[in-house]
Amino acid sequence: MLHLLGQDSRALARKAGISLEDARRITGAVIGRGAPLRSARNVRRAVLDRVEALATPGELRRVACTDAKDGFRRYLLELGDGARVEAVRIPLFDTHHTVCLSSQAGCALGCSFCATGALGLARSLRAWEIVAQLLHVRADSTRPITGVVFMGQGEPFLNYDAVLEAAYTLCDPAGGRIDGRRISISTAGVVPMIRRYTAEGHKFRLCVSLNAAIPWKRRALMPIEEGFPLDELVDAVREHAAQRGRVTLEYVMIAGVNTGDEDAAALGRLLAGIPVRLNPIAVNDATGRHRPPDEAEWNAFRDALARELPGQPIVRRYSGGQDEHAACGMLSSRTR
């Protein structure tokens, strides 16, 4: 692997001082085909020498690969310094895949329902280390990869520049060739970076992990609430929605904690006038501290949400890969 793997064609052309056409050919070889740099066709040796001189060799090694009974596949990958991250291949409609990528090794946010938070933060990933995760998965897949979600280990907006660089590489027509509208970047609510993201006008889908509309409840679940409280977060979401349209809000449902009528009412008040898509998902008991709602509790909460958020899409997310710790909130770099 090469550190320049994280560059899209335009960035590579600028950094290496080469033509955009040569950069596209190199990107097409290294990222589009997953081939060695020297396999790039119709590129002069002097240009390849220049690019190779700028590149620092790097490594991303597969440690383990486990298959869940529902078709999810979890990849445990080791970086050159020994740090480990995970990527998950998600089957869609028996025809294609979405890939969940990590932006950091571990996570500093310490959300109570997330196994990654219990690891602490080892370090942020470089752009090429993010892109290389997708290349590992793609090399192992017979179906096309048509979507990417930055919902693996880490907080993407605490590694903002590398995540955006990787995302643009993944949607480069010469590189990852993934429609930018099918790339989702999720944040636990780093308000200044949400505002920066909105101001910069990026084309990727923004998802915000909300999980409670009552401040003291959210604070107990997500320590980030201390630094970036709900009112500031919702203001940033409102600004983004005004410019880009509907924002996806993720909501981890925890039995007896955030699924009552008062929680639905608080959501209705908090999100009034903001076009959102609410994605509830049952908590996965990775930490042993929480349990998911049963069907009766979910049905009651769904009905309450429909009353409090009339006209807003409420789409329950499927939680796949649980038996192999590939599901949302379960990534902990375990080998089994």
From Swiss-Prot:
SS bonds (residue pairs): 100-328
Coiled coil stretches, renumbered: none
Protein residues bound to S-adenosyl-L-methionine: 154-155, 186, 209-211
Any one Gene Ontology BP term: tRNA methylation
InterPro entries, sorted: Aldolase_TIM, Methyltransferase_A, rRNA_lsu_MTrfase_RlmN/Cfr, rSAM
This protein's GO CC annotations: cytoplasm
Requisite cofactors: [4Fe-4S] cluster
Binding locations of [4Fe-4S] cluster: 107, 111, 114
One annotated GO molecular function: RNA methyltransferase activity
Residues the record marks as active site: 86, 328
Entry keywords, A to Z: 4Fe-4S, Cytoplasm, Disulfide bond, Iron, Iron-sulfur, Metal-binding, Methyltransferase, S-adenosyl-L-methionine, Transferase
Textual note on the cofactor: Binds 1 [4Fe-4S] cluster. The cluster is coordinated with 3 cysteines and an exchangeable S-adenosyl-L-methionine.
Pfam families in the cross-refs: Radical_SAM
Entry EC number(s): 2.1.1.-
Radical SAM core domain span: 93-322
Subcellular location: Cytoplasm
Family: Belongs to the radical SAM superfamily. RlmN family.
Name the record gives this protein: Probable RNA methyltransferase Anae109_4379
Organism: Anaeromyxobacter sp. (strain Fw109-5)
